[in-house]
From Swiss-Prot:
One of its GO terms (molecular function) is exopeptidase activity. Monomer. May form a complex with proelastase 2. GO terms for biological process: leukotriene metabolic process; proteolysis; proteolysis involved in protein catabolic process; response to cadmium ion. This is Carboxypeptidase A1.
Length: 419
């Protein structure tokens, strides 16, 4: 096994798989606004090739950044010179990637049913799409697969529809993996899909949800980016579209929505991880959802699932003005977080995007809320930075289990509070 792993790593190196040997993830603690601004100066130095996992927002909020090996000494010297404290969260990113790849290689057997599918490992795009087909074949009266569009690179964008019948019923939308490197979200989405088929008719609360509403689940919301994380660059976040006049690829699909687009909280630089794109809905992955939601016209809850930081967020992100339904959203978020914590003790914070983390313009749930979808939420799943986007596969099922309890709380509330 060890020889095979070494051989596979060598082959990937030859084929252009990006290497992260010696890269470190630093947690920076800015004591005041002046130090936050100094960290932002670092962010603007493109030659350092820094990858901010948690942005420099305001004092008191941790800033996590992946630093390439050639830039480590410069970054640490800069921070120390300005009296900015930091700690090393991940000593060598590549070591964690090697562990992740070895774990995946050990569980590559092709599943013949969704019962034998391994929910405790990470899967490729093809494997997830095969899982979707298996689920539809096993539960044709409950599950169907619809294609809402094609990606920039021509891949189909699939959504699972769970329904007990009827036309244009009120519906709940859940998406995972809009940021491609957040692998625990796509893995959780797969688990949710199976959970829906298992719990319908068994769990009275969930059965009541599906008896009254359809559920749409988009497990891989950014297929091009997700495929790229498996084949080339595990740390890829954005779409894979091309921007005229720039060699940099991709747009942040969570800054591309028509809600506060172009305001502070997104970047106009195509090389930035938070590049918003040239205009709202420029990304077909975003436009496909916009068109679907608009044409459906009866979506009552919209939940977009990210990682990491252990947060449950509601609008707004682009403005500090409270959402008209803030009191209800805040109380519902509190109830959902309480349910989540009850299973494994995982602590979540909750609140509006702008008050809880930072200003973010052009975000998914700000747009859905502007379309009249009252129950618009974003999750940030495990963890709080110890492993970040490289969450061990052993945490997939516990993460999905606890998140399901929060989702069920939101779905149950949505059914019981029609509008």
């Amino acid at each position: 096994m060890k020889r095979l792993l070494i051989l596979s790593l060598l082959l990937e190196a030859v084929c252009g798989n990006e290497n992260f040997v010696g890269h470190q993830v630093l947690r920076i603690s800015a004591a005041d606004e002046a130090q936050v601004q100094k960290v932002k100066e670092l962010e603007d130095l493109e030659h350092l090739q820094l990858d901010f996992w948690r942005d420099a927002a305001r004092a008191g909020i941790p800033i996590d950044v992946r630093v390439p090996f050639p830039s480590i000494q410069s970054v640490k010297a800069f921070l120390e010179y300005h009296g900015i404290s930091y700690e090393i969260m991940i000593e060598d990113v590549q070591l964690l990637l090697d562990e992740e790849k070895q774990q995946m290689s050990a569980f590559q057997a092709r599943a013949l049913s969704t019962d034998s599918f391994n929910y405790a490992t990470y899967h490729t795009l093809d494997e997830i799409y095969e899982f979707m087909d298996l689920l539809v074949a096993e539960h044709p009266q409950l599950v169907s697969k619809i294609q809402i569009g094609n990606t920039f690179e021509g891949r189909p964008i699939h959504v699972l529809k769970f329904s007990t019948g009827g036309t244009n019923r009120p519906a709940i939308w859940i998406d995972t993996g809009i940021h491609s490197r957040e692998w625990v979200t796509q893995a959780s989405g797969v688990w949710f899909a199976k959970k829906i088929t298992k719990d319908y008719g068994q769990d009275p609360t969930f059965t009541a949800v599906l008896d009254n509403m359809d559920i749409f689940l988009e497990i891989v919301t950014n297929p091009d980016g997700f495929a790229y994380t498996h084949k080339t660059n595990r740390m890829w976040r954005k779409t894979r579209s091309h921007t005229q006049g720039s060699l940099c690829v991709g747009v942040d699909p969570n800054r591309n929505w028509d809600a506060g687009f172009g305001m502070a909280g997104a970047s106009s630089n195509p090389c930035s991880e938070t590049y918003r794109g040239k205009f709202p809905n420029s990304e077909v992955e975003v436009k496909s959802i916009v068109d679907f939601v608009t044409s459906h016209g009866n979506i009552k809850a919209f939940i977009s699932i990210h990682s990491y930081s252990q947060l449950l967020l509601y609008p707004y992100g682009y403005t500090s003005e409270p959402a008209p339904d803030q009191a209800e959203l805040d109380q519902l978020a509190k109830s959902a977080v309480t349910a989540l914590t009850s299973l494994h003790g995982t602590k979540f914070k909750y609140g509006s995007i702008i008050d809880t983390i930072y200003q973010a313009s052009g975000s998914t749930i700000d747009w859905t809320y502007s379309q009249g979808i009252k129950y618009s939420f974003t999750f940030e799943l495990r963890d709080t930075g110890l492993r970040g986007f490289l969450l061990p596969a052993s945490q997939i099922i516990p993460t999905a289990e606890e998140t399901w309890l929060a989702l069920l709380t939101i779905m149950d509330h949505t059914v019981k509070h029609p509008y």
